[in-house]
Amino acid sequence: QPTVMRFCRSIGVQGLADFKLKLASGLTGGAITVAHCHVEISDSDAELARKVLGNNASAALALRDMLDVKALTAAIELLRGAQRVELLAVGSARVVADDMQQKLLNLGIVSSFFADPQAQEMSAAMLKPGDVALVISRSGALPELLRTVKVAQGCGARVLAITASGSPLAKLADVLLTLNHPEGNLNFVPMIVRLLQLMMLDILSVGLARRDTAQRTSAAELEEGQLHGMRISGKLKFGGHLE
């Protein structure tokens, strides 16, 4: 019995009964999922690592299975046709927004992101019809972010939101990519939602990158030429953001 229980836990199931259920699901065409486990203070380092990695894998599989493909297609087309993309995010989502802006620039898409919420609102006020506000938020309920989104909409920009379903931000969005995931019960548990946001943006980036190959290649060559010149002149000491 102890050996069986250790095996079950190692593959992310709660016990023999849970393993049989997951196995039966796999044999009937379903997928054996990775169970979500809460991190406890009493956990060993090995248990901590297993749970964190297992939770990340579980969240990624859930995103794959519940992704709204129609909304994804609409989001890719919206970004492809945008004259300018303004990224809006606060808190930990700012890191995600900054990463996406770099991706958009690499794809030759005019984009901007300001970490300061007031600067975001000022920049949103300069948007025009044909522009897109890409908004990233776990809760979709922060007042300052919602205010900035309304400013962008008032200027004629369309809103693409990556946030929780049913949130105030979700209700404002022209196109919504839903991310719902409960966080752990400890402050030091990594934010799985942030990883899901990054994965969602990776999906969008790949969707954009598979088209307009000539434009993408031209932008990449231009950037590489600029970085090479900066390296030669000694102005770039730590390489570009692609390195």
Predicted feature residues:
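Glycine-rich phosphate/diphosphate-binding loops that line cofactor/substrate pockets in enzymes
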Residues: K70-A82
